[in-house]
């Protein structure tokens, strides 16, 4: 997955990553496979959780994705991740996936990560 950091907002406790969709991610209908979209969320959530965990690593304990619109090949998408709560035993996050060009909301997600 090709991703790069777009924004980091301390006050919002948010981080935004831009992903470029790739040919290997397409499904039989020609759109981006839901598993690839879930992978974008898990990647972005994981980076933020590991940074939040400090000296510890963090692992995914649960994650939920809601697919709202299709994602097409060649589309650049922005995934904005928010830290909902960072405790000692769990880091809770939520995220929103947008079309980078139109700013339309494509998917939402949430999940928890456990510092090890």
Language model features with spans:
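A generic structural signal for short beta-strands and their flanking turns/coil linkers
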Residues: 1, 11-15, 59-63, 75-77, ...
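Catalytic strand-loop segment that frames the active site of acyl-thioester-processing enzymes
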Residues: 1-32
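A structural signal for short, hydrophobic beta-strand segments that form beta-sheets
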Residues: 5-7, 60, 83
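Beta-strand residues in well-ordered beta-sheet regions across diverse protein folds
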Residues: 16-18, 80, 94
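Hydrophobic residues in beta-strands and at strand termini
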Residues: 19-21, 67, 115
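Active-site helix/loop of acyl-thioester processing domains in fatty-acid/polyketide metabolism
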Residues: 32-55
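Hydrophobic beta-strand-centered segment that forms part of the acyl-chain substrate-binding groove
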Residues: 47-77
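HotDog/MaoC-like acyl-thioester-processing domains
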Residues: 71-73, 82-116
